[in-house]
């Protein structure tokens, strides 16, 4: 399939209205796929996301002996034997951070060698803290650059009473170890060390999914979890819509003064990015300072929205955005300054947006480099709702988590140049 080189958004000039259901949660889908793959028996996952990231996870599990059927666009039927098998070739996971981190840890439960690799972007994303934690368990694991590829020479088991992990860079390291730990031989305490972890809510998603698949896990302190060696059992599992995807629709609604029905109440989400709704709803009077540490994937959405706010906005607690699919702080400042020089400034790991509501209605031709990052593409599309001339480069990168994004906006009344 030929990729679209660029897409120019035509400001609709009217409120956006209609029903727009976000896809299933990427974070929950990839957790559930792995847990179902580790379980013995057949699990049925409904409401699931079918996207680049979840396809990478599903294909990797297939390569490790798990049978996965897809009877429709939102369902996975997963049949596992209770044990993952060594794949015949390296696992290629594109730029899927969840799949890469989760499968690196799960590879310790494989009796054989597993190589976890990704594309040129994934090969720049750090995985050292997870590798170091696994080594302390006696697991033979190597990552020469501190980034993928990672080679795990597993024995199918590990023994540990306690695992220390620095989750300062990513909560995914912690989630990976938690899911691995239920396959151990004895109870394990997993304890955070180092810098305060961001996005603790994603660990709550992990433990909730683990419990749904039969694991026993308990939070014994603010930084410690105890996991029993239960393994996993097959389960039917319903996946809620993606809160990160919902943020674009919430922002489109307030920017256009429209009315968009997401098909699910705003308070029904359990994902961390759902916290963004209360912030977005305050537009055009966003707070002067926004802490993005607990809603990291929503920061690009709110940063572009902030360009049209009544007063400037400083984003703090977002250092982790530098090691996402791209350096999102740099990508946001670059894109905003392409729209108008001086619109954004980086101060250390903070981002300051010098808001100007007068931007709305102007013609400001700007090509937005997405750096192949789905969230940069989807966020800057919002600017195109109010400014004439916004062109998104590599718009198909949204396929990572929201393949129907452009069609969804079109159904609400947005038109484009450069895409059918």
Curated annotation (Swiss-Prot):
The active site is at residue 297. Catalyzes the transfer of the enolpyruvyl moiety of phosphoenolpyruvate (PEP) to the 5-hydroxyl of shikimate-3-phosphate (S3P) to produce enolpyruvyl shikimate-3-phosphate and inorganic phosphate. It is found in: Cytoplasm. 3-phosphoshikimate binds at residues 26-27, 31, 170-172, 297, 320, 324. GO terms for molecular function: 3-phosphoshikimate 1-carboxyvinyltransferase activity. It catalyses: 3-phosphoshikimate + phosphoenolpyruvate = 5-O-(1-carboxyvinyl)-3-phosphoshikimate + phosphate. Phosphoenolpyruvate binds at residues 26, 97, 125, 172, 328, 375, 400. Disulfide bonds: none annotated. PROSITE patterns: EPSP_SYNTHASE_1. Its EC number is 2.5.1.19. The gene is aroA. Residues 1-24 are annotated as: Disordered. This is 3-phosphoshikimate 1-carboxyvinyltransferase. Belongs to the EPSP synthase family. Its main location: cytoplasm. Monomer. Keywords: Amino-acid biosynthesis, Aromatic amino acid biosynthesis, Cytoplasm, Transferase. Pathway: Metabolic intermediate biosynthesis; chorismate biosynthesis; chorismate from D-erythrose 4-phosphate and phosphoenolpyruvate: step 6/7. GO terms for cellular component: cytoplasm. Pfam families: EPSP_synthase.
